[in-house]
């Protein structure tokens, strides 16, 4: 990543609701892993600008997906897709998207029970208005 410090802050902030934490960091890299475990499962390294990418993190449920998105918006990061169902992926695919400071598309996703899909869609419309009233502007870290 080019914006190493900003990206480290981004990932520490938005992955915490998914129970992923910063395990270690030095001047060149930062490692993240599941809370309560010793291993690193995700690594960012300081580097040159490359092509942006799309990373998806699996959440336990829709509440975690919502919390991921809310944490990012509250911290001033850019929304790239509000929490909600993505029927073009699967009928019960629920996801939210943020842009990291280098422009990569970062997703939290889960599969919800189809019986909850209609209620979730209604809840999302209300929550989306609330989330964007917190921070409708551009990302904070550049």
Name each model-derived stretch:
Residues 47-48, 53-59:
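Helix-adjacent hinge/juxtasegments
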Residues 18-21, 53, 63, 75, ...:
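Long, contiguous binding/interaction regions
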Residues 40-45, 97, 106-110:
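Conserved beta-strand in the GNAT
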Residues 1-39:
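Core segments of cupin and vicinal oxygen chelate
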Residues 1-8, 55, 112-132, 140-141:
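N-terminal beta-strand motif that seeds the catalytic metal site of vicinal oxygen chelate
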Residues 2-5, 56-102:
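Vicinal oxygen chelate
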Residues 32-37, 46, 98-101:
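Active-site beta-strand termini and strand-to-loop segments that position acidic
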């Amino acid at each position: 990543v080019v914006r190493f410090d900003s990206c480290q802050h981004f990932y520490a902030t938005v992955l915490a609701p998914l129970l992923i934490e910063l395990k270690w960091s030095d001047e060149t890299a930062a490692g993240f892993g599941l809370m309560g475990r010793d291993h690193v499962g995700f690594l960012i390294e300081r580097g040159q600008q490359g092509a942006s990418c799309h990373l998806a993190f699996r959440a336990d449920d829709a509440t975690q997906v919502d919390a991921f998105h809310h944490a990012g918006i509250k911290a001033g990061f850019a929304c790239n897709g509000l929490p909600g169902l993505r029927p073009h992926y699967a009928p019960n695919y629920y996801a939210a998207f943020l842009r990291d400071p280098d422009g990569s598309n970062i997703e939290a996703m889960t599969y919800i029970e189809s019986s909850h899909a209609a209620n979730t869609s209604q809840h999302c419309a209300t929550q989306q208005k609330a989330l964007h009233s917190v921070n409708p502007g551009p990302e904070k870290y550049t």
